[in-house]
């Protein structure tokens, strides 16, 4: 394969036409990566990412990864808090198993896609997904909603976007509709969109926001917040706990950050809130799903603040392996839990996600003759 350079527009072009079959294929690739990390031998060969914070608050993240047949390094630039921007800049270099570089990818869109796909791996099982609430209006919010619409568009009736800026939320809605038109998949014309302008400071007194959170079937948290996005009580009250939901939180990546109230996480593992009893018999205690237990203990502020013990945390690769190996009765219970139980997923991202999906994107680019080729690199 010739060395390939993919710009941001190239990557968007490749993703634009993704339909259910493409998402299913990418899901299988990411699932295999999680399995190799959690129950294979790959975890020991993954250097942990490094973060450097400059005096002005500019942050650089360096995320290496290796597998038997590849290596990669992603560099992420995060603006200082004083800039007022949450947009990140990132680039992924992909090598083969010998270390020969095979491609370089503008990874802004890819990062949002791979993180969102991690959330969707568990979401796709859900029986009820009528009411979705997403916190944030950036690329992560876009791809969480886009993937949900591609896979479950006919089952989604209401999407509420919660953001400090209405303008950005409306731009998100427009891009979702444009992607729908370009691919013919998504069903945005059948969905009712609502925008709520709110911040973590203003949320506690916002009755409308509380109402949509309590009625939600799915909550996607996609913001780099240093405060809880809403109080735990909104999910632990008698009215809110009468229904189950799927919740993912992917925005916080430092110990001083948190999206989900730590009190809610404690309630999931310490109270009947997280307990699932199947109508067919069988019971599961509340746990927190993660991409990497080690990475989350180092970087997930809400998990650390909640003091969630290791035995109450399950990696998605571990769970997938358990489901794959379970006997018929246990497998039925696990699937019922995923479909109807309270499922909470926390991700900080790991390099093997970038490497596995980066290789897929390079292969798709070669197939469709997209990008710039450098045969003599």
Predicted regions mapped to residue ranges:
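Structural motif
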Residues: 103, 131, 217-218, 246
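Rossmann-fold NAD(P) dinucleotide-binding segment
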Residues: 206, 210-211, 215-218, 226-245
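Short glycine-/small-residue-rich Rossmann-like dinucleotide-binding loops
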Residues: 223-225, 251-252
């Amino acid at each position: 394969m010739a060395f390939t350079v993919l710009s941001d527009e190239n990557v968007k072009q490749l993703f634009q036409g993704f339909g259910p079959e493409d998402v299913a294929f990418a899901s299988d690739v990411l699932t295999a990566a999680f399995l190799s990390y959690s129950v294979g031998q790959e975890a020991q060969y993954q250097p942990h990412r490094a973060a450097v914070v400059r005096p002005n608050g500019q942050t650089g993240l360096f995320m290496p990864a290796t597998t038997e047949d590849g290596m990669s390094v992603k560099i992420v630039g995060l603006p200082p808090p004083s800039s007022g921007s949450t947009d990140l800049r990132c680039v992924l270099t992909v090598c083969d198993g010998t270390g020969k570089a095979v491609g370089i990818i503008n990874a802004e869109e890819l990062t949002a896609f791979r993180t969102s796909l991690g959330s969707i791996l568990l979401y796709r099982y859900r029986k009820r997904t009528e009411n979705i609430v997403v916190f944030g209006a950036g690329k992560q919010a876009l791809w969480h909603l886009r993937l949900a619409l591609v896979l479950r568009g006919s089952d989604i009736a209401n999407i509420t976007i919660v953001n400090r800026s209405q303008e950005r939320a409306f731009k998100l809605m427009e891009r979702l509709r444009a992607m729908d038109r370009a691919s013919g998949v998504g069903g945005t014309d059948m969905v009712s969109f609502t925008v709520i302008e709110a911040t973590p400071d203003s949320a506690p007194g916002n009755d409308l926001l509380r109402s949509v959170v309590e009625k939600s079937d799915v909550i996607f948290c996609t913001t780099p917040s240093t405060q809880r996005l809403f109080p735990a009580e909104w999910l632990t009250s008698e009215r809110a706990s009468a229904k189950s939901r799927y919740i993912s939180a992917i925005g916080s990546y430092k110990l001083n950050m948190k999206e989900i109230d730590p009190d809610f996480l404690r309630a999931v593992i310490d109270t009947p809130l997280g307990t699932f009893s199947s109508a067919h018999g069988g019971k599961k205690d509340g746990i927190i799903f993660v991409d990497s237990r080690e990475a989350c203990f180092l970087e997930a502020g809400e998990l650390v603040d909640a003091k969630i013990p290791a035995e109450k945390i399950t990696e998605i690769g571990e769970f997938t392996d358990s489901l794959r190996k379970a006997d018929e009765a246990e497998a039925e219970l696990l699937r019922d839990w995923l479909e109807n139980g309270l499922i909470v997923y926390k991700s900080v991202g790991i390099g093997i996600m970038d490497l596995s999906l980066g290789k897929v994107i390079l292969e798709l680019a070669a197939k469709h003759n997209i990008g710039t080729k450098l045969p003599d690199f």
